[in-house]
């Protein structure tokens, strides 16, 4: 199959999904462009900041478009390109975008509250606490997986088969650019806040010029640190991202990053159109696949939890309800921000599939390379067609894939901190009325340190060990969010039946996957090949996730059923 046909099919399906199904949802749910949003009603200059549609979209897209749409499809390609493409398109339009839009809508309609607090309002405090604990544990997995990926990418030193250590210019140069991004973003944030009336086109030009300048500096001044050192640097950055006002760091950084990511997408898209490489992957490799290391994987549920962010991701709901809902200036922007950002991410997932298909050998993805390396080298090959030197293209792509993970990391660090605070939040947010222990546990600095500490411990196991559990927990969170949004829609007399199919399917997929994960880790302990810091911690987290998932699912479904009975009784009366 020629990749040009695949990309055109994807664009048509995703475009039709946005214009057709997305607009239909907005109409059925009752998006009101005249309603006052939480960002306007509760503006505080910190979390609640009314922002333009493009600015909120930039934050949403750059936060959700993490490593998932690159990592997932490339790993899942072991089953063949057909099942991966089908799940990306079906999942993106009817599962992922619906969840992202729905959670953003529910949050905006409830004062910008997180999805956990929305659950408390319609289900009860116990449901909220269990959900918040689930979310917090999940954020630890995201921090662990993505920190490990970024530190591995930034690692300035590579050990060869003979033990000789050589410098990794691509990683070191990308690291310099990424660190410059943090400083420049803060300056840009101050400028945007000071010059509120700056035209959007002027802000865009300034952002693009700054990106080019930082890229040039990175090429000249690579920063060589090893992976462990980068772990510490990343944790320090995440601390700042968690506690600083949104307008000062996260919003301007996400805004600038989006131009870089869209540039990457456009370059890759045009590269596919010009080069239109053939898909060298097999179309379908069967329902059971055995890797070169002898590990057996089943199409169900492995495919669905591996692809993760490109099709549906619970993490997106935390971004939608945790940060984006507090910056939406007009309800009419929600379709573009919530549904639209997910559609664009799905397109990124399709491009990742095409990249691995183009570089595949003998019907399989190249062995010995990480998904990031496959993606970076594949896109760099596309960009070479435009005369861009391979070394420059490789650094640019390394920088882009690192930016994908970093923008998700800073959002999830903030969301993890907020989830931890919500766990111990009582009926009042007035600290003067709280006991000392509650003041400490709900303090944003303390909550951030605790969240990052446990995320760092899990990170030591490496992303390849954390990813399977992350994928399962991620999709389980999506299922729970869909149930929660359905409860909200039902309670407010809005159409909600469209959420039932994705909700039930994701519950079946994720509980199966996470049970498989527990069984696999137990077997490693029985074989004597497990360690506490890797399999042990994962096993503990997995068991907690299963228990919490069951409790939240039963609580929410019970509420849905009871509401139906209550409504029926009212109708009879």
Sequence positions of predicted segments:
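Loop-to-transmembrane helix boundary motifs in multi-pass membrane proteins
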Residues: 125-140, 340-347, 393, 422-461
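Membrane-interface "cap" regions at the ends of multi-pass membrane proteins
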Residues: 13-70, 258, 298, 302, ...
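Extracellular/periplasmic helix-exit of transmembrane alpha-helices
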Residues: 272-289, 343-378, 411
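Flexible loop linkers connecting adjacent transmembrane helices
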Residues: 23-49, 72-75, 85, 89, ...
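Extracellular loop-to-transmembrane helix junctions
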Residues: 2-19, 76-107, 116, 175-181, ...
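Hydrophobic alpha-helical segments and their helix-loop junctions in multi-pass secondary transporters
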Residues: 189-194, 209-232, 241-242, 247, ...
């Amino acid at each position: 199959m020629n990749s040009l046909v695949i990309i055109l099919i994807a664009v048509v399906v995703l475009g039709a999904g946005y214009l057709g199904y997305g607009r239909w949802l907005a109409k059925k749910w009752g998006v009101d462009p005249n309603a006052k949003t939480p960002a306007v009603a509760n503006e505080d200059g910190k979390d609640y900041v009314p922002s333009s549609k493009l600015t909120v979209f930039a934050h949403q897209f750059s936060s959700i478009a993490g490593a998932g749409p690159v990592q997932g499809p490339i790993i899942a390609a072991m089953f063949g390109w057909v099942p991966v493409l089908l799940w990306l398109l079906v999942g993106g339009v009817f599962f992922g975008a619906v969840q992202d839009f729905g959670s953003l809508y529910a949050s905006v309609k409830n004062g910008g509250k997180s999805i956990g607090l929305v659950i408390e309002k319609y289900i009860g405090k116990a449901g909220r606490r269990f959900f918040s604990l689930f979310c917090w544990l999940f954020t630890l997995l995201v921090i662990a997986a993505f920190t490990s990926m970024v530190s591995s990418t930034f690692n300035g030193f590579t050990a060869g088969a003979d033990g000789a250590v050589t410098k990794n210019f691509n990683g070191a140069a990308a690291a310099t650019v990424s660190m410059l991004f943090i400083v420049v973003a803060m300056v840009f944030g101050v400028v945007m806040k000071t010059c509120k009336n700056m035209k959007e086109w002027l802000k865009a030009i300034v952002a693009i010029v700054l990106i080019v300048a930082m890229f040039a500096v990175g090429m000249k001044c690579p920063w060589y640190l090893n992976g462990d050192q980068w772990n510490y640097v990343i944790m320090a950055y995440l601390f700042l991202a968690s506690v600083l006002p949104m307008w000062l760091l996260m919003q301007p950084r996400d805004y600038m990053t989006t131009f870089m990511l869209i540039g990457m997408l456009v370059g890759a898209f045009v590269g596919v159109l010009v080069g239109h490489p053939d898909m060298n992957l097999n179309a379908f490799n069967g329902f059971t696949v055995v890797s070169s290391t002898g590990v057996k994987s089943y199409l169900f549920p492995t495919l669905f939890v591996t692809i993760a962010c490109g099709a549906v991701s619970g993490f997106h709901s935390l971004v939608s309800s945790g940060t984006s809902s507090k910056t939406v200036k007009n309800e009419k922007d929600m379709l573009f921000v919530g549904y639209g950002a997910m559609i664009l991410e799905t397109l990124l997932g399709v491009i990742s599939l095409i990249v691995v298909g183009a570089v595949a050998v003998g019907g399989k993805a190249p062995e010995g390379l990480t998904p990031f390396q496959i993606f970076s080298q594949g896109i760099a090959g596309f960009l070479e067609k435009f005369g861009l030197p391979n070394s420059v293209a490789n650094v640019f792509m390394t920088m882009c894939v690192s930016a994908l993970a970093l923008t998700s990391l800073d959002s999830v660090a903030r969301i993890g901190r907020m989830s931890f605070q919500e766990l111990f939040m009582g009926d009042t947010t007035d600290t003067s009325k709280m006991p000392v222990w509650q003041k400490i546990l709900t303090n944003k600095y303390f909550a951030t340190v605790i969240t990052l500490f446990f995320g760092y411990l899990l990170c030591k196991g490496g992303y390849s060990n954390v990813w399977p559990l992350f994928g399962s927990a991620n999709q389980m969170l999506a299922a729970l969010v869909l149930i929660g949004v359905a409860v909200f829609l039902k309670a407010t007399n809005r159409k909600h039946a469209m959420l039932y199919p994705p909700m039930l399917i994701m519950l079946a997929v994720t509980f199966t996957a996470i049970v498989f994960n527990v069984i696999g880790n137990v077997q490693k302990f029985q074989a004597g090949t497990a360690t506490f810091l890797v399999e042990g911690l994962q096993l503990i987290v997995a068991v907690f996730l299963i228990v919490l998932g069951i409790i939240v699912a039963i609580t929410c479904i019970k509420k849905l059923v009871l509401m139906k009975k209550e409504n029926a009784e009212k109708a009879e009366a």
